[in-house]
Design a protein with these regions (language model features):
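Surface-exposed, charge/polar-rich loops and edge strands
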Residues: 33
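Active-site-adjacent beta-strand/loop module that shapes the phosphate/pyrophosphate-binding cleft
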Residues: 60-85
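Short, well-structured beta-strand/strand-turn elements
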Residues: 48-57
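N-terminal strand-loop-strand
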Residues: 1-24, 28-29, 50-51, 74-76
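Nudix hydrolase/Nudix homology domain
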Residues: 18-22, 85-137
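Hydrophobic alpha-helical positions that pack around
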Residues: 25, 39, 43
């Protein structure tokens, strides 16, 4: 789930990630929960950021642990981050231009994003190309 605030998006990193790699936040649906509600809950749990609008982007099969990844965009309704340090090592807002550099492996400080085998790569790519208009489909 890629949380957007205009020209910025929220990315986080887990301790086991490759050095310098950031990704969109992620989580699992709970029984009886809609995908949209899961996005709002997971973002709130991991970064304490409230989300308003949620828009479905795509799905992608994921073999570990036999899951279906559901890619969504979400509009941030606040931007103050409080990181859940059990879930994440860090979370921060990145400019769209920074994300483009991360995808191209040209970020000034060597930060990177997941490769094309992961749905988050495609979420980030769509955001770089279309900006916040990805929320309108």
């Amino acid at each position: 789930m890629l949380v957007i605030d205009g020209e910025r998006c929220l990315l986080g990193r887990q301790r086991h990630f490759a050095p310098g790699m950031y990704s969109a936040l992620a989580g699992f649906l709970e029984p009886g929960e809609t995908a949209e509600d899961a996005v709002r809950r997971e973002v709130m749990e991991e970064a304490r950021v409230k989300c308003a609008q949620v828009a479905y982007f795509a799905s992608h099969p994921w073999p570990f642990p036999s899951s279906l990844m559901i890619g969504c965009f979400a509009q941030a309704s606040d931007t103050d981050i409080v990181v859940d340090t059990v879930e994440l090592e860090d979370a921060r807002w990145f400019l769209r231009s920074e994300v483009a550099a991360m995808l191209a492996a040209t970020h000034a400080t060597g930060l990177s994003a997941p490769k094309p085998f992961a749905i988050v790569h495609h979420l980030l790519q769509a955001y770089v190309v279309k900006g916040a208009s990805v929320l309108s489909g």
